[in-house]
From Swiss-Prot:
The lineage of its organism: Eukaryota, Metazoa, Ecdysozoa, Arthropoda, Chelicerata. Blocks neuromuscular transmission. Acts cooperatively to potentiate the activity of huwentoxin-I. Paralyzes locusts and kills mice following intracerebroventricular injection. GO terms for molecular function: toxin activity. This is U1-theraphotoxin-Hs1f. It comes from Cyriopagopus schmidti (Chinese bird spider). Expressed by the venom gland.
Length: 35
């Protein structure tokens, strides 16, 4: 399982490649949500 976003890694302390939330999205509650 790959972390879907950077904050997921920070929260769980896992080592994996982050897929950051991009334009129009923000990180909230460990998920990408529309801004």
């Amino acid at each position: 399982f790959e972390c879907s976003i950077s904050c997921e890694i920070e929260k769980k302390g896992e080592s994996c490649k982050p897929k950051k939330c991009k334009g129009g999205w923000k990180c909230k509650f460990n998920m990408c949500v529309k801004v």
